């Protein structure tokens, strides 16, 4: 939907693009599908994501030139590379610019979908995390949250690592029930894992839980604004600043009156004013003057939570507060955090052949990110153990729900980057709901992401191409000559064109 229609004809004629769309979106099952595609088909499906990989370089640059402020319009950034290399690579651009880092590193367990060796000894695991934790700190703003998911195997070591690596921070450890049926163990059946929420000490950094979401088990707290407790605490004289009228008109709250004088006593809970306005006072059902639970100078801060409610039996109006936002508890036990129901099942609907067996619940990650961003609708989130792209999916869902502008950065080194990580993002942008790998609807959103591949030192060595004459090969039969030859000649001469060749940087884009 961000592409100028002048490019539509070329897109419709591109066979590689059409084939990818069939694989991703099953467009061949749409009524208006044809081969080749038509411009009208593209106009009717504006959220199909084009991949510039399939187009000539000149065409790609011409397209990008039509998009103003491309960086500002990019919603995500994905790297297919070793994550430490990515952390170092993005420092020039993103140093002190990230709001949140969320990672779900290998747990050092016997089974895991993550590519890294999964039976690290504790010291090796600590080294793996410490290097990346230390390097990534430079990317964070002064106000930040760093969230690390972990289980019981390395939880203690992670806590010690955090204490030794970061200073002046708070490390709040949340327990999340991700496996309600329990995992087999010798003594206990583990049902939970942990999330370390790390943020600067002495500040308000964690957002509130929104219980207005019907998918949550915890519901909003709905009760009268009037203090309904018993005893002296609910009476007017216990807090004079909490006795004042609230004005309603046509069933809506329109104004808050001033605190009443001590010698003023209304006749009833409701008094009619001018122009159809009704004054509502905090008077209990027995006629005793009570009080609102908020003083006059603070009640306007909860205006959005208040409503006027008419009781037809009593023929009177009262003020009701619907509180939907609460501090997150340190135990997350909602069924929505089940990794099976909302992790594996969700991913299998999108990608039935995914090799990932235990992805995080989409709600676990989205709630962590929302809490970590302090409920902000914008911010940059970095995940350098991206796996199946649950983090990107969560960011996209959050933006879809509130029209936010959160941005994700992912790093994933696995070969499944092209078969799972990137395609999952392409799919969930096009449709929110999926079944058997096919979209249920076309409720897509406008989206753009960039993906890059970084070659590591190991990649360069793997790509060495050696040329050796028969005479050179004979020299290698002499063990003394062989060692000197390998050290002084092979790397310098034979593999010269395979290693990083600085002469080729005269034409960097042709390297």
Q: Where do the PLM segments sit?
A:
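Accessory, often C-terminal, charged low-complexity segments
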Residues: 1-57, 75, 91, 95, ...
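Conserved P-loop NTPase mechanochemical-coupling segment
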Residues: 62-78
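Small/polar loops that bind or transfer phosphate-bearing groups
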Residues: 79, 149-150, 383, 412
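Short amphipathic alpha-helices and their capping/turn segments at secondary-structure boundaries
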Residues: 83-100
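Conserved proline-anchored active-site loop of SAM-dependent methyltransferases
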Residues: 96-111, 381-395
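Mobile active-site "lid"/loop adjacent to the S-adenosyl-L-methionine
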Residues: 99, 105-128, 141-144, 153-154
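Short acidic/His/Gly/Ser-rich catalytic and metal-binding motifs that mark active-site loops
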Residues: 107-114, 339-344, 462
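Conserved SAM-binding loop and adjacent beta-strand
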Residues: 350-363
């Amino acid at each position: 939907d961000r592409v100028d229609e002048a490019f539509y004809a070329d897109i419709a004629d591109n066979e590689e693009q059409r084939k990818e769309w069939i694989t991703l979106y099953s467009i061949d099952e749409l009524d208006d599908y044809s081969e080749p595609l038509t411009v009208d088909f593209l106009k009717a499906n504006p959220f199909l994501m084009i991949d510039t990989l399939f187009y000539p370089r000149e065409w790609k640059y011409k397209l990008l030139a039509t998009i103003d402020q491309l960086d500002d319009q990019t919603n995500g950034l994905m790297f297919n590379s070793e994550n430490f290399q990515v952390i170092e690579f993005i420092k020039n651009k993103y140093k002190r610019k990230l709001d949140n880092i969320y990672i779900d590193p290998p747990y050092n367990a016997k089974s895991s979908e993550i590519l890294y060796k999964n039976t690290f000894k504790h010291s090796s695991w600590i080294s793996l995390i410490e290097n990346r934790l230390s390097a990534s700190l430079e990317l964070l703003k002064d106000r930040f949250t760093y969230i690390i998911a972990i289980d019981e195997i390395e939880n203690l070591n992670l806590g010690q690592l955090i204490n030794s690596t970061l200073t002046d921070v708070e490390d709040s450890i949340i327990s999340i029930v991700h496996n309600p049926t329990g995992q087999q163990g010798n003594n206990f059946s583990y049902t939970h894992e942990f999330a370390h929420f790390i943020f600067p000490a002495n500040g308000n950094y964690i957002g509130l839980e929104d219980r207005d979401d019907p998918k949550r088990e915890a519901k909003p707290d709905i009760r009268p604004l009037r203090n309904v407790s018993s005893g002296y605490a609910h009476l007017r004289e216990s807090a004079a600043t909490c006795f004042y009228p609230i004005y309603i008109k046509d069933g809506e709250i329109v104004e808050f009156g001033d605190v009443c004088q001590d010698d003023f006593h209304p006749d009833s809970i409701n008094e009619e004013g001018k122009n159809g306005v009704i004054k509502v006072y905090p008077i209990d059902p027995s006629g005793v003057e009570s009080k609102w639970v908020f003083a006059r100078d603070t009640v306007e801060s909860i205006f959005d939570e208040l409503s006027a409610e008419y009781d037809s039996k009593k023929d009177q109006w009262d003020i009701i507060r619907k509180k939907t936002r609460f501090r997150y508890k340190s135990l997350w036990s909602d069924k929505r955090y089940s990794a099976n129901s909302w992790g594996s099942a969700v991913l299998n609907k999108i990608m039935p052949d995914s090799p990932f067996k235990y992805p995080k619940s989409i709600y676990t990650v989205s709630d962590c990110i929302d809490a970590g961003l302090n409920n902000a609708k914008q911010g940059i989130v970095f995940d350098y153990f991206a796996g199946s792209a649950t983090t990107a999916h969560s960011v996209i869902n959050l933006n879809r729900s509130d029209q936010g502008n959160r941005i994700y950065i992912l790093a994933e080194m696995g070969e499944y980057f092209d078969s799972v990580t990137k395609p999952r993002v392409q799919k969930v942008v096009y449709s929110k709901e999926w079944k058997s790998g096919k979209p249920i609807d076309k409720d897509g959103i406008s989206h753009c992401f960039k993906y890059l591949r970084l070659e590591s030192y190991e990649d360069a060595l793997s790509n060495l191409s050696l040329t050796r004459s028969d005479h050179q090969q004979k020299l290698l039969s002499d063990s003394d000559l062989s060692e000197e030859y390998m050290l002084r000649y092979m790397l310098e001469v034979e593999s010269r064109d395979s290693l990083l060749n600085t002469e080729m940087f005269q034409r960097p884009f042709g390297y």
